[in-house]
Regions:
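Conserved, function-defining micro-sites of small-solute handling proteins
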Residues: 1-171
Length: 171
């Protein structure tokens, strides 16, 4: 079984390491490519049999009947793919998220941080932004500073474990 990813230690390689750990050793050959698009092309060209990608990157191919979604790494099912189970539903204790955060320099004055947080929250919850996300097959998972820090701490540990399990990096 050949697994394609967007590259070594990348956002689409790490989930395989997490699944490997949760499944107790998945026997696959890794085919790193130069990005998500080439990883999907590897599947479409029958050079690989599986990949991990975002819903938005694969949705057009799923709708065209060229790819079959098997599971999602999130804790809940995707709104775009409600019939596709989570890995946890299938008995694998693992989660993985592709996310985007907004950061400021550590020395940024608190009033500026609060102004930025308020503006970002307002923009993130706007109808225009939500519509744009939905059109791209994405879902809003907004977390403000303290909640994002909690997520960051858990996700950072999960990511560290995945990188170490792949090898060549010491814990």
């Amino acid at each position: 079984l050949v697994f394609s990813s967007g590259g070594l230690y990348g956002a689409t390689h790490l989930p395989l390491a997490l699944l490997d750990k949760a499944a107790g050793g998945v026997k696959v050959r890794h085919l790193p490519t130069n990005g998500g698009g080439p990883a999907i092309t590897a599947i479409l060209g029958n050079n690989a049999q599986c990949t991990t990608q975002s819903v938005s990157a694969t949705l057009p191919h799923i709708k065209a009947g060229k790819l079959r979604p098997l599971a999602v790494f999130s804790a809940t099912r995707s709104k775009e793919l409600p019939d596709v189970p989570t890995l946890k539903e299938l008995g694998y204790d693992t989660e993985y998220y592709l996310w985007v955060g907004i950061f400021a320099p550590k020395a940024t004055p608190e009033p500026v941080v609060l102004t930025l947080r308020d503006a970002i929250k307002k923009a993130a919850h706007s109808d225009q932004f939500r519509t744009s996300l939905a059109n791209a097959g994405q879902e809003l998972a907004y977390l403000d500073g303290p909640d994002f820090q909690k997520f960051w701490d858990v996700d950072g540990k999960r990511t560290d474990d995945a990188v170490i399990s792949i090898g060549r990096v010491q814990g």
